[in-house]
Amino acid sequence: MPQESPIEFPAALPPELRELWSQLSEILTAFGDAQDRLDPPKIPEYADRLAPLAAALEKTVHAIDVTKLDRDAPAAVLTQSGVQLLGAASRFQGARTGPHEILKAFQALRPIARANDILFPLANRFVEISEHYLTPARRSDVSLRESLAKAAANPERGLMHFNNQRGHRGGYSLYVPENYTPDRAWPLIVALHGGSGHGADFLWSWLRDARAHGCLLAVPTSRDRTWSLHSPGVDAAGLNRMLDSVSGKWNVDAQRLLLTGISDGGTYSMLLSIVKQSPFTHYAPVAAAVHVLQNREGRVEAPVRDTRIYQVHGAVDWMFPVEKARAAAQALKDAGAAIDYREIADLSHNYPRDENPAILRWFSPELFESN
């Protein structure tokens, strides 16, 4: 009897799983849109969008008996991810009414990262899931998907966690593109979560861009509930150890080190930008209190001349008013910083993943030359 040929990955999902994946993909997209543009007045709108998607997914998930499946079987993995998403959708409905609607909404979205944790190991096995973890502009790139899948078995590639399990603080998560080779230097993105956040959650804000464009991605977790804004050296020591460890094992381009972050993470990135010995070459604070660098007269007297900054702020940010962001950007420019200020009309106090390509193009145009 002739042996069956081994399956070459990435392969198409089996027909019996395509409806489930279609539903997962649709609700993940809806959740992603909510995460990117969540604003208190928009919570009911997003809840209305999620409700029918969750109802359809729930029906499909409940029809699958996972007790009869191996834990790592694709059907079981997709179902486990679906359970996380259904929990998030249910909790999000509770954010329609107060008090503290925005806090409820943020808490409801936390299982999305766990759903991604479960799904991502299938990205290099199945075309549809691989496409989901790429930027829209790169999803049709067959050669990219194949190069990622062929090298996926290497234990020093892909997604790794270093003392960064949820519940632990002070560690970091690292993504090394599966098609990494040590014969050239690779750019590194370091992304800092917001207050009360965690690196293992925030990494999903950047992973598809790093995977699509060939960047290493390090996402640390602050030692305390947020970054050491009043004593920058506390968390800086951990960041330096992380950089030393990553650079010692992988070929990191010291001329392309991006430090970005959301809210407190963005504020902390700006505090590090004025440190003379900072190893970072570019800074991209998002929804941050950049005005902390200004003195009482509104001037920036810190050494920022020629510092490369891409500042992103939402016109409807409810935490840090946009007027302060505009004034800080002008003060940085007056002080000699090489600053690009990007104001997004419909952005509140969120991380806008759709701005990542522009940040990367500013950071390293070479990443787009062959795309």
Segments (PLM) and residue ranges:
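C-terminal catalytic histidine-bearing segment of alpha/beta-hydrolase fold enzymes
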Residues: V322-N371
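Gly/Ser-rich "nucleophile elbow"/oxyanion-hole loop immediately N-terminal to the catalytic nucleophile
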Residues: E178-R184, S228-S263
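Active-site loop/turn elements of alpha/beta-hydrolase fold enzymes
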Residues: S222-D224, A288, I344-D346
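Short, proline-enriched alpha-helix->beta-strand connector loops that line the catalytic pocket
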Residues: P303-I309, A335
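Primarily recognizes the serine-hydrolase "nucleophile elbow" in alpha/beta-hydrolase
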Residues: F202, S247-G248, Q255-R305
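A domain-start/cap signature at the N-terminus of enzymes
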Residues: P2-A185, N371
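Short substrate-entry loop that stabilizes the transition state in hydrolases
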Residues: Y180-S228, V292, W318
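Short beta-strand/loop motif that positions the catalytic acidic residue
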Residues: Y310-H313, D317
